[in-house]
Regions:
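Transmembrane helix-boundary elements of multi-pass transport/secretion proteins
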Residues: 4, 18-85, 132-141, 171, ...
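A short amphipathic helical element positioned immediately N-terminal to and/or at the very start
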Residues: 4-20, 213
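Hydrophobic alpha-helical transmembrane segments of multi-pass membrane transport proteins
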Residues: 32-41, 57-129, 156, 175, ...
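Transmembrane helix segments
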Residues: 43-45, 160-203, 207
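Membrane-spanning helices that line or support transport/gating and their immediate boundary helices
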Residues: 77-81, 85, 154-161, 192, ...
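Alpha-helical transmembrane segments and their short interhelical loops
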Residues: 101-173, 220-244
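Transmembrane alpha-helical segments of integral membrane proteins
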Residues: 208-218
Length: 255
């Protein structure tokens, strides 16, 4: 193995062990939170709301909750790891290691993808016996899953690089990630919104991630699957380019 490959494998192992050592917090807790949302909203809205013909509200809700958990936990994994390394001062050991910016980028993102894949599989394992879902377009489903998870992992890495203390990460989470994920069509179809909010929803990249993921289950969505895939792909490329530029320059990492 080359020095870069060894550096990548070591950093990836470190990041995986970081979330695996506290599995109750990083995987079990998000699953419990999502199941509680499902129980509360399913009981409150079942029979009163239906987005698609032949699809119950509980079925409609579940893919959105899975994707919301994926979005929030992918962001949390990379952002918390980066800011923790910066605040504690051990980022210097990563920067001194024989690992390039691309390998560093891939290691952080891959660890976040592994974490949210565990979260999604656990949620499906717990809920599918009670809320059966069709899998109409599995390739579309998988594509949107990894685009969304990758985008938020990269966005979390950017936030961790920009932030100088834990409060900055909390601000980004509470004022950007949480509102954007809640207002992205998780609990409702955007067709039920007034015209202004309907069009405003289309400015939210999280909406396309969730809507496209939902299409993978039902073969139906609020916008065409290719549109969601295009927007999600463009968002991933944009944030990845910005993050790689930051890592290459060592912005707020070396100085």
């Amino acid at each position: 193995m080359s020095p870069d490959q060894i550096g990548f494998a070591t950093l990836l192992k470190k990041e995986v062990m970081r979330f695996w050592s506290v599995l109750a917090q990083t995987v079990t807790a998000p699953v419990i939170t999502a199941v509680l949302y499902l129980l509360v909203f399913a009981q409150a809205m079942q029979g009163r709301a239906s987005a698609y013909d032949g699809v119950s509200y509980t079925q409609f809700l579940l893919p959105g909750l899975i994707m919301m958990a994926v979005i929030q936990n992918a962001f949390a994994n990379t952002s918390s790891s980066m800011i923790q390394s910066k605040v504690m001062g051990n980022i210097v050991f990563i920067l001194m290691a024989p690992i390039g910016p691309v390998d560093m980028f891939l290691a952080y993102v891959a660890a976040a993808l592994l974490r949210v894949t565990c979260v999604a599989i656990a949620m499906l394992a717990v809920t599918l016996p009670f809320v059966p879902l069709p899998f109409e377009a599995p390739l579309v489903l998988v594509g949107h899953f990894f685009l969304a998870a990758g985008s938020l992992a990269v966005l979390g890495l950017i936030a961790g690089i920009v932030a100088q203390k834990f409060d900055h990460i909390a601000t980004f989470t509470n004022f950007v990630v949480m509102p954007a994920s809640f207002l992205s069509g998780v609990f409702y179809s955007v067709h039920s919104l007034p015209p202004f909010w309907y069009h405003a929803s289309h400015l939210n990249p999280f909406f396309f991630m969730i809507d496209g993921f939902r299409y993978g289950f039902f073969g139906r969505a609020d916008v065409a699957a290719w549109v969601s895939l295009l927007w999600s792909g463009c968002f991933f490329v944009a944030v990845s380019a910005l993050c790689l530029w930051m890592l290459q320059r060592g912005w707020r990492l070396r100085h």
